[in-house]
Each structure stands twice: as structure tokens, then as C-alpha cells.
Amino acid sequence: MACIENVLGGHAPSPLVVSVDKNGNQELHHDMPLQCLSSKPEDDAEPWGQPQVPLRPSVNVLTDLDSKQLEWPSERTGSCIPLHSLRAHRHPYGPPPAVAEESLATAEVNSSDALAGWRQEGQDAINVSWEVSGGPPALIVGGTKVNNGGTERGSNNARLHVALPQGKGFFPPRGPQVRGPSHIPTLRSGIVMEVPPGNTRIACRGKLAHVSFPLRGPCHPMHNWPRPIPLSSSTPGLPSCSTVHCFIPPRPPIFNPFLTMPLPFAPPPIFGPPLPSYFAHFHSGGMPAPASPNREHS
């Protein structure tokens, strides 16, 4: 017989008993006492309403070892592990926390799952560093430096230290490199300077900057730039040498401190009688003479 329990909300209101005969037919019996065979004794049997919580099995590495092998020293190492100390450090649910942390740390460094954490934003750091001893460059990723000698633990992440041979390895540039034109004339405050292409730091190589000063009207500055005039050995006043190019600045205008004044000209002739003078109506005899102060006192 088999027992089936219809559990709804943690309660079992209607138990069903299914009986199977020899031919394989099933018969349902209602309102019958529930009888189930259990391998557990009655004292250890748990109620059906409570779920069973499986306990974590205890993991002990030293269970398969014999007590004699632990107490007696081994032939290879010659070390002796007392049995009473191992029994004192046993943990009911597995190895002690210190051993578990060491095993997890070793597994994290040796496994490839630690590489997934380096993809997080803000924690990626790829640096190429040279050793102090002058060896090949090394690629460092993250926070802990893993070397052939051992493992150095950092504060944040684990670093991967890979030695690279010199002359090998490709590292893409960090940003796009945009190269400008070979030479661009610069115009500042009316002074045009044109630097020839090449290394401008090396002097005395026959490459000098051409500087011109436009002194003409306020039109487009390109129209005021003087053009180079080729000078050959046939030009008078110059020594016999190869053909050279030079700039001859234009002559400055003559400075005139006086402003341009109009020229004086004679007035046009007047056809007609001359106008009488303004003082012609006044006669000298008709004007009274001023009285002197001496006559009043006399």
C-alpha cells in the first residue's frame, strides 16, 4: 500500500489510501486511518505538518586516515600529527573557518573565475611596468601582483603579472592620434610666420622661418604678403654664389606730420560798385569829446 497526503496550506484534512492489487488495479479508500511504514522509530519520527530541514553533512578530510598513521611520523616528511589536537579542532559542519578561508583564497587565485571580476567598471587597470633590475616589461592587471616567486595580496583586486619579452606584444593606443598638416601659417597681430616642415628644434640646417610684415592697406592679409624674389649671381651688388631666395620687404611710406591742408586761392572778382564802409556814416567832428576830470575841479 502507498500513502498519499493532500497537503493544502500545511494541513491534511482528507487523507487517501490507495491499495494496489496483484493485477495492477488501484482502489481508493476514503475515511480510513492513515498507515505508513517508516524506518524510523516512533520517538524519532517527525510530524507530517513540519518540513524536514536537511542538515549539512560534516566534511572531514581526516576521516579516512587511520589513527596509527596520524600518530606515527611518516617516512617522507618525518612529521608527527597528534590525534588529540585534530579531534579538538573538528568542526561539526565542516572544516574550521580559518582552513575554509585559506582554501577559498587559494581556489580564487588558481581558478579562472577571478578573471571575471576584472571586467567591472572602475577596477580595470592595465599597466606596463619595467622591472627595477632592467628585465623585460611586465603586464599588470588589477590589484594583486602574481609573480613566479609567490603571490602578493593587494587591497582591492588581484593583479596578474605576466612577463613579456622585449620587442613583442601589441598595445593599442589609448586615444585616436590625429596628425595635422605639415605646416600651417600663423597670423597674429598682422605678423605672418611660416615654419617649414621638419624638426624646428634643430638649428643651422638651412631651414629658417620666413617672417613678413604687411604694411599696406587693411585688405586681405594674403594680398599683402611679399613674394620671394629669386636672386642669382648676375644680380649686381651681390657676391657670386648660387641662386638664393629672399624676401624684400616693401618700402615704408613717407611719414608726413602735417595734415593735408587745402591750398589758398584768390576770391572771385566782384562786378559792381564797392560797398560803403561801416564807419562812413560816423563823422569825427560830430562825436563829443570825453570830459576830463581836471576841468570839473577848476
UniProtKB/Swiss-Prot annotation:
Residues 36-56 are annotated as: Disordered. Coiled coil: none annotated. Signal peptide: none annotated. It holds the Pfam family DUF4645. InterPro entries: DUF4645 (IPR027891). This is Proline-rich protein 32. It comes from Homo sapiens (Human).
